[in-house]
Amino acid sequence: MDLGKVITAMVTPIHPEKDKVCKKRIHHLVNHLIKNGSDGLVIAGTTGESPTLSHDEKIKLFRQVIETNDGRAKLIAGTGSNNTAETIAFTKEVAELGGIDAVLIVAPYYNKPNQDGLYAHFAAVSEASDLPVVIYNIPGRSVVNIEPETIIRLAKLPNIVGVKESSGNLDNISKIIAETSDDFQVYSGDDSLTLPILAVGGNGVISVASHVVGNEMQEMIQAFERGEVQKAAQIHRELLPLMNGLFSVPNPAPTKYLLNQQGISVGPVRLPLVDLNAEQGTKLQAILEGLSK
């Protein structure tokens, strides 16, 4: 299942005065992303501040993105949690909205399941879901790593179509690509590893940087796929300072800062995250401005 090459892990626009998910700002952001290189969107993922969104806010967010998108980009809804039964129930509810192409299911966090528990969790969600499932492996946040052998087993299930790999382990990612079918999609979960993962056979990126350099991310991937490896590598090197700068403080505060500076109003982050201070903002803006020199 082709979900796109540059899939943006979309921030959630918040009204700065009312502290509510803002439909007008969602509409503006979705159009901006699609016009600037995104062929897919992840909604209510980590970058979308899912831990601080209520159930009703997520549903409101999904509905507005579906309406604005109008079938243009692939939509992947973040419906995972560390509670299998709750994940299944929420995934079913989201499927009934229509207009969602797949769900992103994060590895259960905090309760630290072993590999058998991880397999059983994803298998149960897959069996119950009418929507295709993308596994999200992010051991830096979930504490547990979904081992390659577990992902390879899960890839054999008919409704599990891909993985967002944020482990940063190219050996493991290479093994997954080598031992799964060609239609199993392997996405980099780190902007800075997009090109290396493409080089070992990956399919694209679920990106944060694409909020501000989406066209450049597309250009890099397309250059690589045309065999213009040196051009792709040059773009990668040029974008690398920004990719790293967007994680200089906890995500998505830097991304929201740059979008707001560019006139794409997405509001603040929610506590316990905090917005950039003046010094942090100045440094980040300088990195972005340096790309055009």
Curated annotation (Swiss-Prot):
It holds the Pfam family DHDPS. Pathway: Amino-acid biosynthesis; L-lysine biosynthesis via DAP pathway; (S)-tetrahydrodipicolinate from L-aspartate: step 3/4. GO terms for cellular component: cytosol. Its EC number is 4.3.3.7. It is found in: Cytoplasm. Homotetramer; dimer of dimers. This is 4-hydroxy-tetrahydrodipicolinate synthase. It comes from Listeria monocytogenes serotype 4b (strain CLIP80459). The lineage of its organism: Bacteria, Bacillati, Bacillota, Bacilli, Bacillales. The gene is dapA.
